Amino acid sequence: MANPTLFVSYDQNGKKLSFANWISVLSPQDTPFVSMTGKESINQTIFSWQTDALASVDGNNAHVEGSRAEDGEMKPTVIKSNVTQILRKVVRVSDTANTTANYGRGRELMYQLEKKGKEIKRDLEKILLSGQARTDVLADQYLTNSATDPAVVGLNDTHAARKTGAFQFLCAHGGLAGGVVDKTKNGPADPDTGAVTVKVAQNASNPTTNIGFDEADIFDMTLQLYTAGSEADIIMINPAHAKIFAGLQENTQGSRKRIFENTKQFIYEVNSITDPLGQSYKIIVNRWMPTDAVYFFRSADWTQMVLRAPKRTELAKDGSYEKWMIEMEVGLRHRNPYASGVLFTAAGKVAA
């Protein structure tokens, strides 16, 4: 004691800690795509659906009075299919850790299970929005999503993990590269309308820039979707693309300007656009979106096919701990390959 006649806090022993009884988790937990798309229960790992198209418009559909009715051409429906994917998280907590009292939580096991539940939902969001190709040891026995691009086969390995075809794979893409959709190629044209709904951005207004897209690319995609008969009303973007959409409010030619009259607010955000055809799109920023793609879609056209909903299962106890598993099995279905659009940013585009 520096001063034996004055007892200060530094001289105290056995002081009670001042510890906040809460835990701050800053990690983002929002999952827009998983939250906005519907769910449907299934009872098989492989699920299928059918698509069809009308015959081309016949501008010469005129016939002589009293003529014989000739047979017309008819085509069968097209079968599409995808598979479910198993997502899993495991928690193991010692009996001692699960018994001790802690600040900010009750039992350690329950806290860790809650965290893993949120993590598996984020994993699902990231996977479904990727370019992941369908992978299945039986993929060669079922019709696939593109006649020019069969699904990846798991080398006939019975232990290969199934992977559900994700967003880009279920759109009319232009091929695969290393087990994911090739981002350097346009997709095939719709046989019915000629629309191309998976495209690489040209970024024509910035020909010396090797990445990005511009207004012309955006409205070209909305035109392609209109031509295909799509009812897309959402544009989902990575946060890095928000500035490009905000730039639609003005242009360098001076023919379009933002007006800040009688206001002290500076608003740079663009949260919806209406294209020259009168189609309105809501812009949704999603941190789990690929940085090299922009998606145009209607949420009702996408469905999570759930074989097993997320479930907590206690595993066998063979030591002084508790071990639990959270597991789910789900796949993705797209109503029609041409119902949604993918605009790949012009990565690697050679300057003109």
UniProtKB/Swiss-Prot annotation:
It is found in: Virion. It comes from the Viruses. Coiled coil: none annotated. Keywords: Capsid protein, Late protein, Virion. One of its GO terms (cellular component) is viral capsid. Assembles to form a prolate capsid of about 145 nm x 44 nm. This is Major capsid protein. It comes from Escherichia phage Phieco32. The lineage of its organism: Viruses, Duplodnaviria, Heunggongvirae, Uroviricota, Caudoviricetes.
